[in-house]
Design a protein with these regions (language model features):
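Compact structured core domains
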Residues: 81-160, 166
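A short, Lys/Arg-enriched amphipathic alpha-helix from helix-turn-helix/homeodomain DNA-binding modules
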Residues: 117-130, 142, 153-190, 211-229
Length: 271
């Protein structure tokens, strides 16, 4: 397996389009832990093959394929037989997506009845978006992305009320992320056995409480890295015990180092 720090990859974003991020990764064998994103994620396989587990289904992705991953859907996309693969990932803010799709009302969950897409014109449209971002053509991006979004098989679903153990965990994470509750504390405060808490949270989110806490910390760390905070401070801000723990956890859930993520390129850099 190649070292994460040596993998050629770039994160493109711009403060003028805060609802958009593009990741481009080349010839990577780096695996992911099961994770989720608050954004709608759309991936394109450029070379190699990827095994994608998403919402309990397995998909074998090949060059020219697109994969649509709804917000908060648990997934992992890993190399096949430890062979390198290259891919782009678009991350689109869920609120922005709803605003572009009148068929998905505010507050509704975004789902995709057909995650795997083998559609050459749609793949070409995705590649055009990537090309615009790499050229720094900022003005054309919103309209082009809206067209792409309208072509994706998305639909609305009523949000499901979480189990009270999950709701309690969400509340504690929002109140004090660095002091996230232990499983013992969560079980005590929800008056449930630890096994019941794990089962309830996993049923609601597809992740264990420990993974959910790690993901919340990673997402917070990403916001601080995007804001330009020093890497040495971000791990502590997010609640990690030390820099080693922060680095290892960040890599395992994002397949990138904190430094790679922090050293992003603005969409307008190439102008």
């Amino acid at each position: 397996m190649n070292h994460t720090r040596d993998i050629p990859q770039t994160f493109w974003r711009d403060d003028r389009l805060p609802w958009l991020e593009l990741r481009s990764t080349w010839r990577s064998r780096q695996a992911y832990k099961r994770h989720s994103h608050p954004q709608l994620s759309v991936g394109a396989i450029i070379e190699g093959e990827t095994r994608c587990l998403c919402a309990g289904q397995e998909y074998l992705l090949q060059p020219g394929d697109l994969i649509v991953i709804p917000p908060h859907a648990p997934h992992s996309c890993n190399p096949l037989h430890d062979r390198p693969r290259s891919y782009h990932m678009l991350y689109l803010d869920a609120t922005w997506c709803r605003a572009q799709r009148p068929d998905i009302p505010p507050g509704a969950s975004i789902t995709s009845p057909q995650p795997l897409l083998r559609d050459s014109p749609l793949f070409a449209s995705f590649q055009q978006v990537v090309a615009l971002m790499c050229r720094g053509s900022l003005e054309q991006l919103p309209a082009r992305l809206a067209l792409l979004l309208h072509a994706l098989p998305l639909c609305a679903a009523a949000p499901q009320a979480p189990h009270h153990a999950s709701a309690l965990l969400f509340q504690r994470l929002a109140m004090d992320l660095p002091a996230s509750p232990s499983l013992d504390k969560l079980a005590h405060d929800s008056a449930l056995r630890k096994e019941t808490v794990i089962r309830a949270v996993k049923q609601d989110t597809g992740l264990t409480p420990a993974s959910l806490i790690n993901m919340a910390r990673i997402e917070y760390a990403k916001t601080r890295l995007r804001a330009g905070d020093p890497i040495a401070d971000v791990g502590y801000q997010a609640g990690f015990a030390d820099q080693s723990h922060f680095h290892k956890t960040f890599v395992s859930y994002t397949a990138a180092t904190p430094r790679q993520y922090a050293q992003s390129r603005s969409i307008s850099d190439n102008k």
